[in-house]
């Protein structure tokens, strides 16, 4: 097996560059190697970066967006259709927004360009979550203007239209997040829709775009957004000001899309929102009919219905509320992937109170232990903020002690940074940057050891894995188990695969070895 290339391993704090979204037979993430040091040695002596990421960035360049949509639009009957370039930045929720806009544009007859030169106009879907994301978005707008000249801006940073226009006065239009219709109208204003009535061969009823729409992810997994906005007012976060309060989709709408995705060949659904466990609260858990059955727009009911589809269902952005216990019972019954992405953010009650985190008074350790009693195989991923204003060494040590007892499977961390408009900016006793970084390193070193220990326990066991990529030259499949969300968690590297193994296929493998974050397995056809 080839030597590991630590230079290309994604780190936790550096912005990540996404791999190509299309299924491929050439590995692009990094070349794996079975570890030559013990886990205890490697966490101390090696310089391998921390692999689990805090953010869920799903950035797509103009080339990646064009490549991902080419199969759906390449056979367009209007050969001279105008081409729209698309740059998508930010989280999976923003990626879903981009997918919807691209789908609607394609249905209107536009094609998606793969480069700036070939685009009649470029749409940039921005992120405004943290200052580094704001700067990245402003840079992307500038690049699009420089290389194309006709640019429409949408997404979370669109809330700051004055800032965008001050820096980039040449932009044609600015809209906010999930403003689909506004974007479509702005595109049509500056690049008129093709007149498909002039093409006698065009029949919208047999349009190549299926009910699931165009996806910017590989064909075997997709993000399913169940709600928009958030009712919480965490002091470090400005998402409610960018995306509004909680607005849930009716459950029949969610299930129709989920079924369409399954029919399109999707093997794994990643459920996303700002607060997945609050799903349906704004609808007062309204009952709808789907597939001839009454269903409540409620978190538990949705999980039950999704399970019945018979594909992998992975839950992201869940809060540790008591009603999540019932969903863990479904996992214990093997009816959902036993995986929870829960942003705990901290463990010190004093800091959680300053953050105004929901459920901060809950005994989260007791809840985690109870979940493991119900479902011993459950995997818990979380993110944490270190160096929040007012965080003392005692507060930080509380977090480290909590991690030792919690033994989470996947952890990412941010060092706190000010975000324009966040309440936390005005809190006293900001932590010096060097102290933030030192605490970040201590947290991630501790968690690296925990991760290594937990993965060592997998050696000798069998796991079902989903193939994401294949390196035919090395004979290695880059896969994920139920414990691994795409692009943010670890991988399972499977040796000596044969020509019959395909991307998007499930394999049952035996775990032979482990490193701090990844597993290494063998497969017998």
UniProtKB/Swiss-Prot annotation:
Enzyme class (EC, first level): transferase
Sites where the protein binds [4Fe-4S] cluster 2: 230, 234, 237
Which GO molecular-function terms appear in the entry? Answer: 4 iron, 4 sulfur cluster binding; aspartic acid methylthiotransferase activity; metal ion binding; protein methylthiotransferase activity
Q: Where does [4Fe-4S] cluster 1 bind?
A: 91, 127, 156
Metal-binding recorded as keyword: yes
One matching Pfam family is TRAM_2
Give the enzyme's EC designation: 2.8.4.4
Superkingdom classification of source: Bacteria
Question: Where does the record place the region Disordered?
Answer: 1-44
Every copy of the MTTase N-terminal domain together lies at: 82-192
Q: Indicate whether DNA-binding appears among the record's keywords.
A: no
Keywords attached to this entry: 4Fe-4S, Cytoplasm, Iron, Iron-sulfur, Metal-binding, S-adenosyl-L-methionine, Transferase
**GO terms, biological process:** tRNA modification
Q: What does this protein do?
A: Catalyzes the methylthiolation of an aspartic acid residue of ribosomal protein uS12.
Q: Which family does it belong to?
A: Belongs to the methylthiotransferase family. RimO subfamily.
Can you say what this protein is called?
Ribosomal protein uS12 methylthiotransferase RimO
């Amino acid at each position: 097996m080839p030597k590991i290339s630590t230079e290309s391993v994604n780190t936790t704090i550096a912005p990540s560059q996404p791999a190509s979204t299309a299924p491929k037979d050439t590995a692009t993430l990094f070349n794996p190697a079975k570890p030559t040091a013990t886990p205890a040695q490697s966490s101390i002596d090696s310089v391998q970066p921390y692999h689990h990421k805090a953010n869920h960035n799903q950035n797509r360049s103009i080339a990646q967006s064009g490549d991902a949509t080419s199969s759906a639009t390449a056979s367009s009957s209007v050969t001279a259709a105008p081409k729209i370039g698309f740059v998508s930045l930010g989280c999976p929720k923003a990626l879903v927004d981009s997918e919807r806009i691209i789908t609607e544009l394609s249905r209107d007859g536009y094609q998606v360009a793969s480069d700036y030169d070939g685009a009649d106009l470029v749409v940039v879907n921005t992120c405004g979550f943290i200052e580094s994301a704001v700067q990245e978005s402003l840079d992307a707008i500038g690049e699009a203007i420089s290389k194309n000249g006709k640019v429409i801006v949408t997404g979370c940073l669109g809330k700051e239209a004055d800032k965008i226009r001050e820096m980039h006065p040449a932009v044609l239009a600015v809209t906010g997040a999930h403003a689909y219709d506004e974007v479509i109208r702005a595109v049509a204003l500056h690049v008129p829709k093709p007149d498909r009535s002039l093409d006698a061969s065009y029949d919208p009823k047999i349009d190549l775009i299926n009910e699931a729409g165009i996806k910017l992810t590989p064909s075997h997994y997709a993000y399913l957004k169940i709600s928009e906005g958030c009712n919480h007012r965490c002091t470090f976060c400005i998402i409610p000001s960018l995306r509004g309060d909680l607005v849930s989709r009716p459950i029949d709408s969610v299930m129709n899309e989920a079924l369409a995705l399954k029919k399109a060949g999707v093997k794994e659904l990643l459920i996303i929102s700002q607060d997945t466990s609050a799903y349906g609260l704004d609808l007062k858990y309204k009952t709808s009919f789907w597939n001839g059955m009454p269903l409540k727009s409620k978190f538990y009911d949705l999980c039950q219905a999704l399970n019945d589809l018979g594909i992998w269902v992975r839950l992201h952005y869940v809060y540790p509320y008591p009603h999540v216990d019932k969903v863990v019972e479904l996992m214990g019954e093997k009816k959902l992937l036993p995986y929870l992405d829960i942003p705990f953010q901290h463990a010190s009650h004093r800091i959680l109170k300053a953050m105004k985190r929901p459920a901060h008074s809950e005994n989260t350790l007791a809840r985690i232990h109870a979940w493991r009693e119900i479902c011993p195989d459950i995997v818990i991923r979380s993110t944490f903020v270190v160096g929040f204003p007012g965080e003392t060494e005692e507060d930080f040590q509380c977090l480290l002690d909590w991690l030792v007892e919690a033994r989470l499977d996947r952890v990412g961390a941010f060092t706190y940074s000010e975000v324009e408009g966040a309440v936390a900016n005005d809190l006293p006793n900001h932590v010096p940057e060097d102290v933030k970084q030192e605490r970040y390193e201590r947290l991630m070193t501790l968690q690296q050891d925990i991760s290594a220990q937990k993965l060592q326990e997998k050696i000798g066991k069998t796991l079902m894995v989903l193939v994401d990529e294949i390196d035919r030259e090395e004979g290695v499949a880059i896969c994920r188990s139920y414990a691994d969300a795409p692009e943010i968690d670890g991988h399972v590297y499977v040796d000596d695969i044969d020509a019959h193994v395909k991307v998007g296929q499930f394999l049952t493998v035996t775990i032979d070895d482990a490193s701090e974050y990844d597993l290494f397995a063998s497969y017998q056809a």
